[in-house]
């Protein structure tokens, strides 16, 4: 898997399979107030132009509004022009004809920057000069993941940013790998993220989201720290990656005839249900033990009839 593909893949997985996570991000960027259960229509991401096909990261409709979000892992200088191109393709595709005249309305768009620096703008801007000399500035807001603390992510329910949170430590990977104190601080931070995520999910009632997001968090962390064994292994264990894998393996070994993928899904759902019950009953301090102690985990499965 290439450098940027893993980030695009994780982003699109959330957009396509956990679409409700996009709502708080849209509210944050465009100052809307959609409820989390608002109806979202996923539109196709392939837009055909005369000179070829354009593929966007996400195109959504809420009510009568179109939204377009691009996920960008690098600060590409051509991004502003590309956004005009993408948005024009989307607008053309959804054009309307009223009283004999076409109306081409551009979508509300933004760019999610997974990495950012001093030169990353708050808005991407392009001057459009029309044949009659009219000039307008096309502005697209940007979202910089690095500007959000873990606390602000949970306060604003921007759970969609969690898998990419680890990328702020990318440049200090060598130091963290060699410094046990810094490594422990990072692991403590991710233990806090895991606990906050569990509490958030126990409130929302979406128990399956716990394992889904954990899996994506681990996936990005594994890639970012692929050459840093201590960090990669530490984050994976804190977020429960080893346990999720063991659960799916155990179910398959018991001879479940539902196939590898379904066995993994059932194991993750079982663990997610147990963790959810612990949070609901105020036993969050037992989650870490559940993640690491097989016998204790089996005992609680029996206690909750899972």
What are these regions (language model features)?
Residues 1-228:
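Conserved single-residue anchors adjacent to enzymatic active/cofactor-binding motifs
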């Amino acid at each position: 898997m290439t450098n940027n593909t893993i980030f695009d893949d994780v982003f699109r997985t959330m957009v396509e399979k956990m679409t409700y996570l996009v709502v708080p991000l849209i509210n944050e960027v465009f100052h809307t107030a959609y409820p989390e259960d608002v109806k979202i229509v996923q539109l196709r991401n392939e837009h055909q132009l005369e000179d070829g096909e354009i593929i966007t990261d996400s195109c959504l409709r809420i009510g009568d509004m179109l939204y377009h979000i691009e996920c960008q892992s690098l600060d590409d200088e051509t991004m502003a022009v590309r956004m005009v191109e993408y948005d024009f393709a989307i607008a053309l595709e959804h054009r309307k004809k009223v009283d004999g005249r076409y109306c081409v309305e551009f979508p509300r768009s933004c760019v999610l920057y997974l990495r950012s620096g001093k030169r990353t703008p708050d808005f991407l801007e392009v001057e459009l000069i029309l044949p009659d000399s009219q000039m307008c500035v096309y502005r697209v807001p940007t979202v910089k993941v690095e500007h959000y603390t873990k606390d602000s992510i949970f306060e604003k329910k921007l759970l969609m940013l969690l898998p990419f949170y680890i990328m702020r430590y990318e440049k200090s990977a060598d130091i963290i790998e060699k410094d046990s104190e810094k490594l422990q601080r990072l692991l403590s931070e991710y233990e806090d993220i895991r606990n906050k995520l569990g509490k958030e999910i126990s409130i929302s009632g979406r128990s399956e989201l716990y394992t889904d997001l954990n899996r994506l968090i681990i996936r990005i962390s594994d890639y970012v720290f692929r050459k840093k064994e201590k960090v990669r292994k530490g984050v994976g264990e804190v977020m429960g990656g080893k346990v999720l894998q063991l659960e799916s393996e155990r179910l398959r070994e018991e001879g479940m005839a539902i196939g590898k993928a379904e066995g993994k899904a059932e194991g993750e759902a079982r663990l997610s249900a147990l963790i959810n019950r612990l949070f609901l009953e105020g036993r969050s301090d037992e989650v870490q033990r559940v993640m690491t102690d097989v016998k204790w985990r089996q005992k609680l499965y029996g206690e909750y009839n899972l």
